[in-house]
Amino acid sequence: DRENTSFMESQNMQSGDAYSVVYTKDASFGMSICYDVRFPKMYQKMTEAGAEILVVVANFTKPTGKAHWQTLLQARAIENACFVIAVDQVGTKTELGFDAYGHTMVIDPWGRVLASIEEDKEACLMVDLDLSLISKVRTQIPILKNEREELEVHAFHE
């Protein structure tokens, strides 16, 4: 285990210039990768564009994954009242110099983990999603409707 390593995604990847929402006859999917999970506004914009399921494809290191992976994913599900399907690579990434975390999971709009795979295991998940839960949660907790982006910040200094 290489517990003290990190991976600078920006050294190997180039950022995109738009968010992607894919519409199918069954559902709409907001697509994202790895480091994107740290940007809540991105997921809010995809949700406002109609995403019902937020997909995160990642390659988190073990230390970062253990500390942040599930918490970030549950936050994105709750903030947007969406399902989250998050897949993370497993095993040693010799060429990148770190061990990947794994722990693929599916989370519902309440933030409940519906299914997951242990952090060092390779497996497949099959989960039936009840998309009607999205509207139920959004009715009970209308976060997206109650957002007040017009408010200003007033800073007070000593």
Label the predicted regions.
Residues 120-122, 130-133:
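A short, acidic, flexible beta-alpha connecting loop/helix-capping segment that sits on the rim
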Residues 28, 38-124:
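CN hydrolase (nitrilase-like) catalytic-core segments centered on the catalytic cysteine
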